[in-house]
């Protein structure tokens, strides 16, 4: 029941927030103009994906507040902070633009800090820090690339979320189950928006 509550909240937030956010982005002129590297051919609104992060963060917060995640709560908190920071960086990139060097450097810093925090919390070897840092920075870039392909971001997020949720159930890791479920729910709700690419 608590898992359904958290996932449901993530779903509703990700589904409904774009209704209010898209008009704001239109007024601000946050647009993606197609070029030779683009995967789309029409002008689309940028930055709407931050509503997915809002849904995931709401779901994770509820997993802590309701007691769904009773142990390893610090892992959920670290994940939430990492998601919030990465989403903020992505929003700044969409809204103002960042140089490749600055963006890559900040992504790497996020990866280092996030992985180090997880390694310390989970009492793992610090050799995982460089691996995790590169993996996180690389994954953010892959996600950014997929963002312009019709529907692939939503489908990918659902698949990854379900995979982690199932892994959490099989491994009896409540934090992983909760994180996977709210991620899948948030991306599922955003899929109709992602399929439309939100043309102006």
Tell what function each PLM region has.
Residues 1-198:
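"…together with the soluble PPM/PP2C metallo-phosphatase catalytic core" -> "…together
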């Amino acid at each position: 029941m608590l898992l359904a509550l958290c996932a449901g909240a993530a779903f509703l937030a990700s589904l409904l927030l774009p209704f209010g956010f898209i008009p704001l982005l239109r007024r601000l002129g946050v647009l993606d103009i197609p070029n030779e590297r683009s995967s789309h051919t029409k002008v689309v609104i940028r930055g709407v994906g931050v509503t997915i992060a809002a849904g995931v963060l709401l779901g994770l917060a509820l997993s802590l507040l309701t007691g769904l995640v009773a142990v390893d709560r610090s892992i959920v908190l670290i994940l939430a902070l990492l998601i919030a920071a990465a989403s903020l960086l992505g929003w700044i990139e969409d809204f103002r633009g960042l140089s490749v060097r600055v963006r890559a450097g900040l992504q790497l810093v996020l990866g280092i800090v996030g992985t180090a925090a997880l390694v310390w919390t989970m009492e793992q070897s610090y050799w995982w820090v460089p691996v995790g840092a590169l993996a996180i920075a690389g994954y953010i870039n892959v996600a950014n690339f997929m963002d312009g392909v019709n529907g692939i971001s939503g489908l990918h997020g659902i698949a990854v979320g379900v995979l982690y949720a199932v892994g959490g159930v099989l491994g009896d890791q409540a934090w992983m189950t909760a994180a996977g479920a709210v991620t899948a729910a948030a991306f599922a709700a955003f899929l109709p928006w992602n399929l439309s690419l939100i043309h102006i």
